[in-house]
A protein has these predicted regions:
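S-adenosyl-L-methionine
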Residues: 1-23
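Conserved SAM-binding strand-loop segment of SAM-dependent methyltransferases
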Residues: 68-79
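Conserved SAM-binding loop of SAM-dependent methyltransferases across substrates and taxa
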Residues: 33-45
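Conserved class I S-adenosyl-L-methionine
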Residues: 22-32
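Conserved short alpha-helix immediately C-terminal to the canonical SAM/SAH-binding motif I
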Residues: 33, 56-57
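Conserved SAM-binding loop
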Residues: 61-62
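Conserved SAM-binding motif I beta-strand of class I
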Residues: 47-52
Length: 79
């Protein structure tokens, strides 16, 4: 099955408004492809909990999530 990539809408504007800080904890309740989570994690030494009810979305993220050294917790549940 081929999955089309989703481009987050207004990514920079949303993350700028959030203004992530070091040691902050954030929730991405519509994780999907993880675009917002990656952007948040790249801006600060923080933790993100990514929720998605689709197990495929969570499974696809497991490999790249390791690059964040445990700062991304993937949760396969609806928010």
């Amino acid at each position: 099955m081929n999955f089309a990539a989703h481009a987050p809408v207004m990514l920079n504007e949303a993350v700028d408004a959030l203004a992530p800080i070091d040691h902050g904890v954030y929730v991405d309740a519509t994780f999907g492809g993880g675009g917002y989570s990656r952007a948040i994690l790249s801006r600060a030494n923080c933790t993100v909990y990514g929720f998605d009810r689709d197990p495929t979305a969570v499974d696809r993220a497991r490999d790249w999530a390791r690059a964040y050294g445990g700062r991304l917790a993937l949760v396969n549940r609806p928010f």
